[in-house]
């Protein structure tokens, strides 16, 4: 009887020793571990590839503002829209090339008649008085052509989207704005140049005006008055004397 028990115990131990080891108990560096690592790496790489392909097929949704600006750049404008243009300002220019710099003392206009279809630009020389040396401006200002204005305030104080590029008869025109502003955006303690600070308070500030510009209204282009910087002026007030 005892011999039978010993035989069963030995057979049981031999069966346990011959049984395949589980993957959890496989030592590091064994073939089973290498196969498992390769399989997991392949699955991870495949998952990243699938995720990347999914992102390409389904790109992240753009913001409403970006979509509006994109549509403003790609919209095709009817040439008849320029025939309805009124209140033309020399500070607004549609051109296929950068306008002359302000130091050239030229004012550039956009031709609203048939010549616009030929992308012609007319520049006329203005007569400027000759300044003597030693003359200074009360406020220092800078004037530049702004080429990438996308946002502005209309005459009602509401924000509007300004068209940067205009597609007219398969030609892309850029909308430029000639703006003038104070060189120093913050008022200086000394005030305006040449103003007697003993009797007057003064500071330089940028003033604005409204010009007709091509803007986006929904999904179509329309003319609207927008506000741009046009001058740097001196604001003065009399100092109150204490008696």
UniProtKB/Swiss-Prot annotation:
Glycans are attached at residue 148. Residues 47-69 are annotated as: Disordered. GO terms for biological process: cell surface receptor protein tyrosine kinase signaling pathway; modulation of chemical synaptic transmission; negative regulation of neuron apoptotic process; nerve development; nerve growth factor signaling pathway; neuron projection morphogenesis. Keywords: Cleavage on pair of basic residues, Disulfide bond, Glycoprotein, Growth factor, Lipid-binding, Metalloenzyme inhibitor, Metalloprotease inhibitor, Protease inhibitor, Secreted, Signal, Toxin. It comes from the Eukaryota. Homodimer; non-covalently linked. This is Venom nerve growth factor 1. It comes from Pseudonaja textilis (Eastern brown snake).
